[in-house]
């Protein structure tokens, strides 16, 4: 099942958190859910060149707080904050509610699965060798401290007549382990030959929810040699015979 289940959905409530944080019932839930989808589409469209990884939405009675995680905060904010003000006005006009925008920078985009997948997809669209793009992405992630990376591309790769799957991997990616911090993303690259699917798994290490990581990985100390029980002398079977 580790190959089938979504790596982030599998860990929700344990080491991963939801990207929409609010509660509603009945028709209100449906309305707010569709509103979240439209807000994410609008933000992704307006900030297409800003390297947006994820968008988190929190709601209160008359206010919506949106956190945008991006690799290029300068593009999002704009000169003297003009871009972010324009985006905020567009979101308030669409929802009719007060919007608070938080722009958060991603310091290491090479370790963000969404940004890595989008980068590979963009290179494939520009007819860069898919093998080269995948290998470079794996090497960069491992160089920056990832414990494991796996990238899979599927479709009519390099314009082949028959669709196939190509995979590049390094390190380990434990998909069954709940405490394993795995970042996952899936994007599509549109080429003249059809659509290419790109999936990225990045394993960043283990997360221990109820205790510090340092305490959990410490091994029990070995008893000193003076306190160890002496081993009984080996019985000589030849002598007894």
Curated annotation (Swiss-Prot):
Chain positions covered by the region annotation Disordered: 212-241
Domain KH type-2: residue ranges: 39-107
GO MF terms, alphabetically ordered: mRNA binding; rRNA binding; structural constituent of ribosome
Superkingdom in the source lineage: Bacteria
InterPro entries linked: KH_dom, KH_dom-like_a/b, KH_dom_type_2, KH_sf_prok-type, Ribosomal_S3_C_sf, Ribosomal_uS3_bac-typ, Ribosomal_uS3_C, Ribosomal_uS3_CS
Cellular component GO terms held in the UniProt record: cytosolic small ribosomal subunit
SUPFAM superfamilies, alphabetized: Prokaryotic type KH domain (KH-domain type II) (SSF54814), Ribosomal protein S3 C-terminal domain (SSF54821)
Gene Ontology BP annotations: translation
Keyword annotations of the record: Ribonucleoprotein, Ribosomal protein, RNA-binding, rRNA-binding
SMART domains: KH
Assembly: Part of the 30S ribosomal subunit. Forms a tight complex with proteins S10 and S14.
NCBIfam families the UniProt entry points to: rpsC_bact
Family classification: Belongs to the universal ribosomal protein uS3 family.
HAMAP family the UniProt entry points to: Ribosomal_uS3_B
General function of this protein: Binds the lower part of the 30S subunit head. Binds mRNA in the 70S ribosome, positioning it for translation.
Protein's recorded name: Small ribosomal subunit protein uS3
